[in-house]
Amino acid sequence: MVDGGGGASDLLVIFGITGDLARKMTFRALYRLERHQLLDCPILGVASDDMSVGQLVKWARESIGRTEKIDDAVFDRLAGRLSYLHGDVTDSQLYDSLAELIGSACRPLYYLEMPPALFAPIVENLANVRLLERARVAVEKPFGHDLASALELNARLRAVLGEDQILRVDHFLGKQPVVELEYLRFANQALAELWDRNSISEIHITMAEDFGVEDRGKFYDAVGALRDVVQNHLLQVLALVTMEPPVGSSADDLNDKKAEVFRAMAPLDPDRCVRGQYLGYTEVAGVASDSATETYVALRTEIDNWRWAGVPIFVRSGKELPAKVTEVRLFLRRVPALAFLPNRRPAEPNQIVLRIDPDPGMRLQISAHTDDSWRDIHLDSSFAVDLGEPIRPYERLLYAGLVGDHQLFAREDSIEQTWRIVQPLLDNPGEIHRYDRGSWGPEAAQSLLRGHRGWQSPWLPRGTDA
């Protein structure tokens, strides 16, 4: 991990420190940073819960202990950094108290683990008491609900912050294989030579989850799969898979290339999209009985530029599918049917598969000859085995935010472009197709790939059933 050069933060202020994200992710990431001696500032929590610092420390330990074996010395160092302010974040008087607690800190990082509707009010209140002059502000997705709301949110943030002060957190951008994509593509000539329309015939991106909306019914019913994962996670991954090489190492160099991809994509065609909903979804607490919210979405898109013109890209994501897996699959073009080949029949196309979750890794599928038939051979690499223990996404993102490294965060123009791309599907969502839990989604999704390779069974870790 690199220092972004903007100066390290001397205070971390977490709005919503008693919330679900802090319990599941943030405290664990802070603990791991402390363990690796990468945490070097006080932590001030802000939330509406009336609790003491001692109660916050106890709650933090319980949160970390859910997934980590706690080293008392490490935790004691982390606990010593914690302080707490309780109050209503919409009350301007809270920010006077906050200013007193911040004191002489000159480069705070404000991490807003709050509902998106509170982002702008919090930032505007911070500006009113002059707490933003050298600060950075991290905001969690979703960044808006549609194109219009994203434009409004960005305008309100930019009225009091420079773009270099805003960190838009999408945890997918902190995942090891997503970070590695740039290096895999451009540092390996064997891959770089194949990575265009001349060698690749189509691209599939799958994000499957083997669970439902659980206790998030009310939230999810207002969002759906398109907003929840496609507009952000999967389009960001698509950009990294297809972008041109950056001309330098800065965050803007990387984000410029991602933005070029988005600009080359037309708004999605509702006729090339299939929406699904698993049976039983409307029985979940918080979900409307007549809900037409999608828990599954599959779509086709293309990138109209020199490298990718004519290459179809298929994206699917859904809940209550047979397995939990996220992967990118690239199909290479077939070799011709030549006389020496078995039965003069060409082999199946080679495939390059990048598994993002779980057990990140890379697979090259090639063909071999056995007797008078073809056989697929899989050349597999596990990043955990070959590269060592991965840095967890929130650990990576928190550290990047603290040192001012913007490479792992989404930029304003990319957010607006991705909303532009999906907006037609929000305006004209179309029919909802029901599907059984444990299936790979509605049958109608197969029609998107007519004349192409069809949805493939994902590459699952050894011993995983689907």
UniProtKB/Swiss-Prot annotation:
Domain of life of the source: Bacteria
Positions annotated to bind NADP(+): S48, D88, V89, K141
Binding residues for substrate: H171, K175, E209, D228, K319, K324
Catalysed reactions, as listed in the record: D-glucose 6-phosphate + NADP(+) = 6-phospho-D-glucono-1,5-lactone + NADPH + H(+)
Pathway(s) the chain acts in: Carbohydrate degradation; pentose phosphate pathway; D-ribulose 5-phosphate from D-glucose 6-phosphate (oxidative stage): step 1/3
Family matches, as InterPro entries: G6P_DH (IPR001282), G6P_DH_AS (IPR019796), G6P_DH_C (IPR022675), G6P_DH_NAD-bd (IPR022674), NAD(P)-bd_dom_sf (IPR036291)
Keywords in alphabetical order: Carbohydrate metabolism, Glucose metabolism, NADP, Oxidoreductase
Enzyme class: oxidoreductase
Gene3D superfamilies, per database record: Dihydrodipicolinate Reductase, domain 2, NAD(P)-binding Rossmann-like Domain
Active-site residues per Swiss-Prot or TrEMBL entry: H233
Gene Ontology biological process terms, A to Z: glucose metabolic process; pentose-phosphate shunt, oxidative branch
Record EC number: 1.1.1.49
Entry's Gene Ontology cellular component terms: cytosol
Single Gene Ontology MF annotation: NADP binding
Pfam families (alphabetical): G6PD_C, G6PD_N
Role according to the record: Catalyzes the oxidation of glucose 6-phosphate to 6-phosphogluconolactone.
Family: Belongs to the glucose-6-phosphate dehydrogenase family.
Protein name: Glucose-6-phosphate 1-dehydrogenase 1
